[in-house]
C-alpha cells in the first residue's frame, strides 16, 4: 500500500525510495558481490529513527494533515478489523439513504452493539457516492433511527467521527440540516444506553457533534476536533487560507490539547507514522479502549448514566 507521504515527511520519503530501489536491485540480480541486505537494514533503521524524530514534534497543522491522510483508516476499516457479524442498516425511513453515514448491528467480543460512523471515499466514484464524508439531513436522521433502535434493544452505541462537516448544500438546508443536527444532540443526551464516541480523523463542527454526544469521547492521537477548519478560520480572521497553520495552532484542535481542556476522555496512541501505517495495530488499540469504556459504563444504572452525561455536557468550557 502506498504511504502517500505528506510534505513534512519528505525526508522519510526519500529514505524509503532508496530502500525500495536497493530492494528492487537485489531481487533482480542475486549474484551481486556486495551485500545489499545490510545496507537496506541500515536504511530501514535510519528511516524509523527519522520518523520517530519528526513525529515527536508535530505542530497542529501537521496533525490536521495527518487527520485527512488519504490512506487513513475509515469507519468501515475499523468495523472490519474490530467487530464481527456486522449487518448494515440503511435509510432514514423518510427521504433517502445517505452513504456518508454507515451504521448497523455488530458484535464486539461477542457483545451486540450498534455502530454508527461517517464514511469518506478513497477513489473518485466512492468519494462522490459518500459525498466526501459530509452527511445530509437524511444521514443524521438515519443515525438517530439506529440510535433509537439501539435503545429499544438495550444495545450500547459506538460512533466513529470523521467528517469535514455537515453538507452545506442548498438541498440539505431545505431538508432541515440544522434541525436534524439539533435533534440528534437533544436525543443523544437522553438515550438510556451507553454511548462511546471516537474521533478517528476529522471532527468537523456540528457535522461531528451530531453523532458525538456520548458518555465517553475519545480521539486518535493524530485526529482533530474543531468548530471550523483551520483554512476556514484563517479566511475569516486573516482573509487568507494561507494562514491555516497559524489558525490551527491558535484553535487548539489536537487530541492532547482537547484532553488538557477536558473536552475528551482519552487519547488513543497511533502507530509510528500514523494510523495509515498499520491498520491492525490501531484497530487493536481502539478495540481495547472501547472494551475498557464499556466496562466502566456497564456498572451505571440508567439514572446515573444520564446524570453523568448531562454533567459532562454542562461542564464543557469550564477547566
Swiss-Prot record:
GO function terms (MF aspect): acetyl-CoA carboxylase activity; ATP binding; carboxyl- or carbamoyltransferase activity
Location, primary (coarse class): cytoplasm
Stretches of the chain forming a coiled coil according to its record: none
PANTHER family: ACETYL-COENZYME A CARBOXYLASE CARBOXYL TRANSFERASE SUBUNIT ALPHA, ACETYL-COENZYME A CARBOXYLASE CARBOXYL TRANSFERASE SUBUNIT ALPHA, CHLOROPLASTIC
NCBIfam families: accA, AccA_sub, PRK05724.1
Boundaries of every CoA carboxyltransferase C-terminal domain copy: 35-296
Gene that encodes it: accA
GO BP terms, alphabetized: fatty acid biosynthetic process; malonyl-CoA biosynthetic process
Keyword set includes Repeat: no
Species the sequence originates in: Yersinia enterocolitica serotype O:8 / biotype 1B (strain NCTC 13174 / 8081)
EC numbers: 2.1.3.15
Catalytic activity: N(6)-carboxybiotinyl-L-lysyl-[protein] + acetyl-CoA = N(6)-biotinyl-L-lysyl-[protein] + malonyl-CoA
Gene3D superfamilies to which the protein is assigned, alphabetical: 2-enoyl-CoA Hydratase, Chain A, domain 1 (3.90.226.10)
Pfam families linked: ACCA
Name of the featured protein: Acetyl-coenzyme A carboxylase carboxyl transferase subunit alpha
Keywords: ATP-binding, Cytoplasm, Fatty acid biosynthesis, Fatty acid metabolism, Lipid biosynthesis, Lipid metabolism, Nucleotide-binding, Transferase
Taxonomic lineage of the native organism: Bacteria, Pseudomonadati, Pseudomonadota, Gammaproteobacteria, Enterobacterales
Pathway annotation from the record: Lipid metabolism; malonyl-CoA biosynthesis; malonyl-CoA from acetyl-CoA: step 1/1
Amino acid at each position: 500500500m502506498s504511504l502517500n507521504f505528506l510534505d513534512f515527511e519528505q525526508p522519510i520519503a526519500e529514505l524509503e525510495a532508496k530502500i525500495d530501489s536497493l530492494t528492487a536491485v537485489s531481487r533482480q540480480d542475486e549474484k551481486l558481490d556486495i551485500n545489499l541486505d545490510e545496507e537496506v537494514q541500515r536504511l530501514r533503521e535510519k528511516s524509523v529513527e527519522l520518523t520517530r524524530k519528526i513525529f515527536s514534534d508535530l505542530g497542529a497543522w501537521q496533525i490536521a494533515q495527518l487527520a485527512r491522510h488519504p490512506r487513513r483508516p475509515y469507519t468501515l476499516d475499523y468495523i472490519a478489523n474490530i467487530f464481527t457479524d456486522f449487518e448494515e442498516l440503511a435509510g432514514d425511513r423518510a427521504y433517502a439513504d445517505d452513504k456518508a453515514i454507515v451504521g448497523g448491528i455488530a458484535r464486539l467480543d461477542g457483545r451486540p452493539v450498534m455502530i454508527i460512523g461517517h464514511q469518506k471515499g478513497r477513489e473518485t466514484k466512492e468519494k462522490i457516492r459518500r459525498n466526501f464524508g459530509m452527511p445530509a439531513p437524511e444521514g443524521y436522521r438515519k443515525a438517530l433511527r439506529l440510535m433509537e433502535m439501539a435503545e429499544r434493544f438495550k444495545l450500547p452505541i459506538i460512533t466513529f467521527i470523521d467528517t469535514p462537516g455537515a453538507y452545506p448544500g442548498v438541498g440539505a438546508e431545505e431538508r432541515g440540516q440544522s434541525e436534524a443536527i439539533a435533534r440528534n444532540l437533544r436525543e443523544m443526551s437522553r438515550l438510556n444506553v451507553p454511548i462511546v464516541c471516537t474521533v478517528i480523523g476529522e471532527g468537523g463542527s456540528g457535522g461531528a457533534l451530531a453523532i458525538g454526544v456520548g458518555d465517553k469521547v475519545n480521539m486518535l492521537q493524530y485526529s482533530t476536533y474543531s468548530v471550523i477548519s483551520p483554512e476556514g478560520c484563517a479566511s475569516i480572521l486573516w482573509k487568507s487560507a494561507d494562514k491555516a497553520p497559524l489558525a490551527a495552532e491558535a484553535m487548539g484542535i489536537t487530541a492532547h490539547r482537547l484532553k488538557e481542556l477536558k473536552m475528551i476522555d482519552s487519547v488513543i496512541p497511533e502507530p509510528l507514522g500514523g494510523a495509515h501505517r498499520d491498520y491492525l495495530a490501531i484497530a487493536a488499540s481502539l478495540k481495547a479502549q472501547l472494551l475498557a469504556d464499556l466496562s466502566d459504563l456497564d456498572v451505571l444504572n440508567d439514572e446515573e448514566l444520564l446524570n453523568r452525561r448531562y454533567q459532562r455536557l454542562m461542564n464543557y468550557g469550564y477547566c
